[in-house]
């Protein structure tokens, strides 16, 4: 990795989850932080990473963390420990999880390194919500264009369930 011609933002969990000693060695050898995915799932795991915070980036996915409040707690703890975060996404997340991820990313503030997701109907045949939250040109989701600041609730309307009936013969 050191011989490649560019620097990495981070290397996502290059060994088995929770093999922190090995991940530290890789970070030391490459000079790149390790992006923790399966190795950081709960807020109580963040404090142990604080002693060498520069070695880590925590990948926060709302679905992986167990919901919005747990994700926000991890983001807050990471910020207090000086550990940057990426707000990640599962492949095929709907606009509902994209909207939740926007809340988490906003809470991360300057501690946010990157954000994934907002694939919408680029990947999904149909979405469960309107408007469909989806990135456009350059991979940018223009969140301000959706009027969330003045909308009620999350600014999404769930579509009727009959739109999602699937035939077993398909």
Feature names for model-found ranges:
Residues 1-100, 125-126:
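Catalytic core of soluble alpha/beta enzymes
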Residues 91-170:
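Flexible C-terminal active-site loop/helix
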């Amino acid at each position: 990795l050191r011989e490649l011609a560019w620097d990495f933002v981070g290397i996502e969990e290059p060994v088995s989850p929770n093999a922190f000693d090995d991940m530290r060695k890789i970070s030391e050898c490459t000079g790149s932080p390790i992006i923790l995915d399966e190795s950081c799932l709960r807020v109580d795991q963040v404090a142990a990473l604080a002693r060498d915070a520069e070695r880590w980036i925590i990948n926060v996915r709302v679905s992986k963390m167990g919901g919005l409040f747990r994700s926000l707690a991890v983001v807050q703890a990471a910020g207090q420990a000086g550990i940057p975060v990426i707000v990640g996404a599962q492949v095929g997340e709907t606009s509902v999880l994209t909207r939740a991820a926007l809340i988490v990313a906003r809470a991360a503030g300057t501690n946010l390194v990157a954000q994934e997701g907002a694939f919408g109907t680029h990947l999904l045949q149909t979405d469960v919500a309107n408007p469909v939250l989806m990135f456009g040109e350059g991979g940018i989701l223009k969140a301000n264009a959706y009027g969330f600041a003045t909308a009620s609730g999350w600014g999404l309307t769930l579509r009727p369930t009959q739109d999602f009936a699937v035939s077993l013969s398909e």
